[in-house]
C-alpha cells in the first residue's frame, strides 16, 4: 500500500480518481480549499485537510504545503487542478530531492511549454499538427524602432484574420479569452486583457458545431502511449463554451495520432489532456490547448474501461504503465456532471429537445463525474457549491457574459 497526496482535492475529478486508487488499496490524503465540494465529501478519501488556496494565496499555500510534508510521509503526489499542477511542477525538483516523494507532473520547463498557449501553437505549427492560426500579440508598451502598436497588431491580424480570439498565454479555463471582430475592437480590448493576464496571443476563431472533443493520454517514459480516451462533449456550461456536463466516449484514431505527435515533440511524460475543436465550415479539427493535469471529465475514461489511476501507480511507483488493449475500449458511454448539468438545463433553450433526453438519469452506459448511489455526497455538496458560486454576482457575470 502506498500513501498518495492529492492536491486541489476539492475538484470533481478527485471523486473517480480516489475511488479507483482506493480499489487498488492505497491510502489517500487530499488538500482541499473548501469542505463544501465534491472532492472533499467523497467517501474514498482517508484523510483530508483544508489548505490555503494555491491560486489566491500562493505563498501561504507553499508554506502550508511544506509544513504538511514535514509532518506526513507520502510516496506520490498527484495534482488534480491547473493551479496545483503549475505549483508542483515548479517545486518538483525540491520535493523529490529533499523529501524523496515522487511528483506526478512534468518538470517546469516542459510543463511551461505545454501550458503556454502561444508556445504550444508554435510547436503545432512547426511540426504540422492540427491547430488554428495563432500569433503572439506584442507588448502593450511596444516602442521598438518607432513601431506603433497599431501597425504590429495589423500585421498579426493579416495572418490570423477575423473573427479572432484574444487568449492569455497563461490562464486557467476560459479566463481572459475574448472574441474580437475587427482591428478597432482588438485595439480597444487587448490592452485591458494584457494588463490583467500578461502576454497574449491572437488566435483564429473556430466556429464550432454544438460539440467539441477532449482527448486524454498517458505517455510512458519510453514514449509509448499507455492509454487514451476520446470524448465528444455535447453539453457544456456556460453555454458559450464551457466545461463538459454531458459527453460520450468515442473512437477517433486521427485525433489520438495528432495528440501523440504533439506529446512526442514536447518530450512529454505522464498524463495530458487536450481540447480539440472542429471547424463547422470545413470539418477540420484543431488542437486548442493542453491541460497538463487530469480533467474534470476523467470519469469518462473509467467508463470506457481505461484505468488512468492504475497507469499513474504503475508508471511512477512500479515498473511502468501497462499498454491498454484498445479492443477493450467502450464507445458510447454517457457521462454526466449532474450539478453542472442542472445549470445547463436552466439556461439552455434545448432543455426539452436535446437527444438523448436530459431526463435519462439511469442506464447501463450512464455514469456521473460527481458521484454515484454508492458515494452520493459529492453530488450534493458539488451542487450546493455551484449554487453558492452563482449567488456571487461577479462570478455570475464572468461566467454568463457573451
Q: In which residue ranges do the predicted regions lie?
A:
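ATP-dependent carboxylate/phosphate-activation module, predominantly the ATP-grasp catalytic core
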Residues: 184, 193, 204-267, 291-316
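ATP-binding N-terminal substructure of ATP-dependent carboxylate-amine bond-forming enzymes
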Residues: 1-104, 141-151, 380-396
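A short glycine-rich, hydrophobically flanked beta-strand micro-motif that places a catalytic Asp/Glu
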Residues: 269-281
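Protein kinase-like catalytic core scaffold
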Residues: 164, 225-226, 284-289
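Active-site nucleotide/adenylate-binding loops and adjacent lid/helix of ATP-dependent enzymes
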Residues: 111-209, 221-223, 253-257
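Short glycine-enriched loops at secondary-structure junctions
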Residues: 32-37, 82-84, 221-225, 231-233, ...
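Peripheral (often C-terminal) accessory segments that flank ATP-dependent C-N-forming ligase machineries
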Residues: 314-402
Amino acid at each position: 500500500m502506498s500513501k498518495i497526496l492529492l492536491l486541489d482535492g476539492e475538484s470533481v475529478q478527485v471523486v473517480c480518481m480516489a475511488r479507483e486508487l482506493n480499489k487498488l488499496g492505497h491510502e489517500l490524503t487530499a488538500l482541499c480549499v473548501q469542505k463544501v465540494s465534491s472532492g472533499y465529501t467523497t467517501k474514498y478519501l482517508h484523510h483530508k485537510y483544508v489548505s490555503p488556496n494555491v491560486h489566491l494565496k500562493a505563498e501561504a499555500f507553499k508554506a502550508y504545503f511544506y509544513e504538511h510534508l514535514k509532518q506526513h510521509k507520502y510516496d506520490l503526489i498527484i495534482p488534480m487542478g491547473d493551479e496545483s499542477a503549475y505549483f508542483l511542477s515548479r517545486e518538483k525538483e525540491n520535493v523529490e530531492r529533499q523529501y524523496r516523494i515522487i511528483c506526478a507532473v512534468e518538470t517546469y520547463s516542459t510543463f511551461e511549454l505545454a501550458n503556454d498557449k502561444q508556445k504550444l501553437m508554435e510547436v503545432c505549427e512547426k511540426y504540422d499538427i492540427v491547430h488554428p492560426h495563432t500569433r503572439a500579440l506584442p507588448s502593450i508598451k511596444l516602442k521598438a524602432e518607432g513601431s506603433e502598436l497599431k501597425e504590429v497588431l495589423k500585421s498579426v491580424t493579416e495572418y490570423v484574420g477575423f473573427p479572432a480570439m484574444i487568449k492569455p498565454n497563461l490562464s486557467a479555463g476560459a479566463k481572459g479569452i475574448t472574441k474580437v471582430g475587427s482591428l478597432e475592437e482588438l485595439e480597444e480590448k487587448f490592452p485591458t486583457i494584457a494588463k490583467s493576464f500578461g502576454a497574449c496571443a491572437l488566435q483564429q476563431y473556430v466556429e464550432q458545431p454544438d460539440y467539441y472533443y477532449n482527448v486524454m493520454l498517458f505517455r510512458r517514459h519510453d514514449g509509448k502511449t499507455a492509454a487514451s480516451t476520446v470524448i465528444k462533449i455535447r453539453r457544456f456550461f456556460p453555454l458559450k463554451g464551457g466545461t463538459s456536463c454531458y459527453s460520450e466516449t468515442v473512437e477517433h484514431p486521427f485525433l489520438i495520432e495528432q495528440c501523440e505527435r504533439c506529446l512526442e515533440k514536447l518530450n512529454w511524460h505522464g498524463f495530458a489532456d487536450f481540447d480539440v475543436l472542429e471547424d463547422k465550415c470545413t470539418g477540420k479539427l484543431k488542437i486548442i490547448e493542453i491541460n497538463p493535469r487530469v480533467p474534470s471529465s476523467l470519469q469518462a475514461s473509467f467508463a470506457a474501461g481505461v484505468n488512468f489511476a492504475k497507469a499513474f501507480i504503475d508508471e511512477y511507483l512500479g515498473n511502468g504503465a501497462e499498454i491498454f488493449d484498445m479492443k477493450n475500449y467502450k464507445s458510447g458511454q454517457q457521462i454526466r456532471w449532474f450539478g453542472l448539468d442542472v445549470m445547463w438545463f436552466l439556461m439552455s433553450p434545448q432543455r426539452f429537445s436535446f437527444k438523448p433526453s436530459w431526463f435519462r438519469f439511469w442506464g447501463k452506459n450512464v455514469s456521473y463525474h460527481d458521484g454515484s448511489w454508492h458515494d452520493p455526497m459529492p453530488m450534493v455538496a458539488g451542487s450546493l457549491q455551484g449554487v453558492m458560486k452563482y449567488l456571487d454576482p461577479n462570478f455570475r457575470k464572468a461566467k454568463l457574459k457573451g
